């Protein structure tokens, strides 16, 4: 599913091509590109969920949290997001690329990926997609885009 998401993002969204194709044509194009039907459906559902996240007040309690609040991960999140990825999320919060609200959107979207081995590169793509879909996050998106295309994130181990 991650491959389909990256393909869609690079082909349509990131390249500023207007996405006016209907879902059936899009599915046909993705099938012709070699993606499996199940992965296509999951990716399209994932994108719908992402769009829905910004329309709801599901993170209203997060918007009220202070900048000194510390995120405690559930066991399921710990199992799905390794230490390196969690550290990267914290790093992005510290340099103000992510807010508490966008961090929660990223975590929510990562947990729906149904992947056992989320790589740091996959996480970066998810973050980029989330920031692209949240109004007012253009600067954070640009910073994240730079981090995605450079291998050194400035993190120390």
From Swiss-Prot:
PANTHER family: PROTEIN SMG (PTHR38692:SF1). This is Protein Smg homolog. Belongs to the Smg family. It comes from the Bacteria. The gene is smg. Disulfide bonds: none annotated. Pfam families: DUF494 (PF04361).
């Amino acid at each position: 599913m991650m491959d389909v998401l990256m393909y869609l993002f690079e082909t349509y969204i990131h390249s500023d091509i207007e996405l006016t194709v209907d879902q059936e044509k899009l599915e046909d194009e993705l099938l012709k590109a070699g993606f499996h039907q199940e992965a296509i459906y999951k990716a399209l559902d994932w994108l719908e969920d992402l769009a829905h996240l910004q329309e709801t007040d599901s993170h209203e309690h997060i918007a009220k949290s202070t900048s000194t609040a510390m995120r405690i991960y559930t066991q399921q999140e710990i199992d799905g997001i390794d230490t390196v990825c969690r550290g990267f999320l914290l790093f992005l919060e510290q340099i103000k690329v992510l807010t508490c609200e966008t961090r929660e959107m990223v975590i929510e979207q990562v947990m729906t990926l149904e992947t056992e081995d989320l790589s740091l590169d996959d996480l970066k793509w998810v973050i980029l997609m989330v920031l692209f879909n949240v109004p007012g996050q253009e600067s954070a998106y640009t910073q994240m885009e730079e981090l995605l295309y450079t291998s050194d994130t400035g993190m120390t181990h």
